[in-house]
């Protein structure tokens, strides 16, 4: 929004031209989202406590989690508010990339809100029925996938980028829709599964978003894109604003979500942030890179699939409890140790993913 005001004011003072630079607006976007989260966080936590919107803890969960019962949840609203305000202020509202991301965050945030509302307000421990949650996620993801395919303006927007391969970028055609759908829905649910310990999901989300900010910037510059053999995507630089807003809002939220957490993000946060990461990966044509950089999310999801599959087929469990972070808790690891080690793994995988841009 302020881009247009700065463009108008440039005729009176050329210094306002600095707002035309994505990097400058990205920094302001990060700071805006972070300051908003830090400023509004205590007020929101107090409000959630007054409304008695507290975390529901399953009786079959680890005993150490019983103390978390009643901790304010739905803190993802704080993250979403910070991201929306930041992007609307510093993003180019004429960019389809910006509106796609706002739609995804809003749609999946609404799904998560309904789920959280049923759990904490209506005291339904199951929340939104899994079937309906999946249907709503699918409708939102398919809407985005069809739109992106129909509005693609270049071949690069529907190519598949393979890490480690320089000149292998097959054209997906209509299969783009299928890949986009599974990437968005899968990423949304993967982050949701990871969000089981204090700060466990938000920090890897911040790391992956920061990495995608760099990739989006490189993809939006023809020289960098050609040098790295990745698709040149005109206008994708505006995704940098969205990514840095997620980083800023996420770090601000982590201030209150770090162990012992004062607030949890809830499904309103985890489903929307996961979908956002998946959508960004689709937009910059780096779905496979998301699997690498978001390896912690993949690990958590695979542990659940293996656990359920093993129990149904063999009647035996592989892990003491799934997702896998609970397995390590039940092995006796203190919660902070599990969290920080998963963060370290995430940092390693993000750096590995970025390295693949050059290892071709």
UniProtKB/Swiss-Prot annotation:
Chief location: membrane
Compartments in which it is found: Cell inner membrane
Pathway membership, UniProt: Cell wall biogenesis; peptidoglycan biosynthesis
Domain of life: Bacteria
Record-linked Pfam families: Glycos_transf_4, MraY_sig1
EC number(s) per entry: 2.7.8.13
Listed InterPro entries: Glycosyl_transferase_4 (IPR000715), PNAcMuramoyl-5peptid_Trfase (IPR003524), PNAcMuramoyl-5peptid_Trfase_CS (IPR018480)
GO CC list: plasma membrane
Keyword Magnesium annotated: yes
Transmembrane regions: 21-41, 74-94, 97-117, 134-154, 168-188, 199-219, 236-256, 263-283, 288-308, 338-358
PANTHER family in the record: PHOSPHO-N-ACETYLMURAMOYL-PENTAPEPTIDE-TRANSFERASE (PTHR22926), PHOSPHO-N-ACETYLMURAMOYL-PENTAPEPTIDE-TRANSFERASE HOMOLOG (PTHR22926:SF5)
Protein name listed in UniProt: Phospho-N-acetylmuramoyl-pentapeptide-transferase
Natural source organism: Shewanella loihica (strain ATCC BAA-1088 / PV-4)
High-level lineage: Bacteria, Pseudomonadati, Pseudomonadota, Gammaproteobacteria, Alteromonadales
């Amino acid at each position: 929004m302020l881009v247009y005001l700065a463009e108008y004011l440039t005729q009176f003072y050329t210094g306002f031209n600095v707002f035309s630079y994505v990097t400058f607006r990205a920094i302001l976007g990060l700071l805006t989202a972070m300051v908003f989260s830090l400023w509004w966080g205590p007020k929101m936590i107090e409000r959630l406590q007054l409304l008695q919107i507290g975390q529901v803890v399953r009786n079959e969960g680890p005993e150490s989690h019983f103390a978390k019962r009643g901790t304010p949840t739905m803190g993802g609203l704080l993250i979403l508010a910070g991201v929306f305000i930041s992007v609307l202020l510093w993003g180019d509202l004429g960019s389809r990339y910006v509106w796609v991301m706002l739609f995804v965050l809003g749609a999946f945030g609404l799904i998560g809100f309904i789920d959280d509302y049923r759990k904490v307000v209506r005291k339904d421990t199951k929340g939104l029925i899994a079937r309906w949650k999946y249907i709503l996620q699918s409708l939102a993801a398919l809407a985005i996938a069809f739109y992106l395919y129909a509005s693609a303006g270049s071949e690069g927007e529907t190519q598949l980028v393979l890490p480690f391969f320089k000149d292998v970028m097959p054209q997906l055609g209509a299969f783009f829709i299928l890949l986009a759908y599974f990437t968005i829905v899968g990423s949304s649910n993967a982050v949701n599964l990871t969000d089981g310990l204090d700060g466990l999901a938000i920090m890897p989300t911040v790391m992956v978003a920061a990495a995608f900010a760099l990739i989006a910037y490189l993809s939006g510059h023809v020289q960098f894109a050609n040098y790295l053999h990745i698709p040149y995507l005109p206008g994708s630089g505006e995704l940098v604003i969205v990514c840095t807003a997620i980083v800023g809002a996420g770090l601000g939220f982590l201030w209150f979500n770090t162990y012992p957490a004062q607030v949890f993000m809830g499904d309103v946060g985890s489903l929307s942030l996961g979908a956002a990461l998946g959508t960004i990966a689709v937009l910059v044509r780096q779905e496979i890179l998301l699997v690498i950089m978001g390896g912690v999310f993949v690990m958590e999801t695979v542990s659940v699939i293996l656990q359920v599959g093993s129990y149904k087929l063999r009647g035996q469990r592989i892990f003491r409890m799934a997702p896998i972070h609970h397995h390590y808790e039940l092995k006796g690891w203190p919660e902070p140790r599990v969290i920080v080690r998963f963060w370290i793994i995430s940092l390693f995988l993000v750096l590995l993913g970025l390295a693949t841009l050059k290892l071709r």
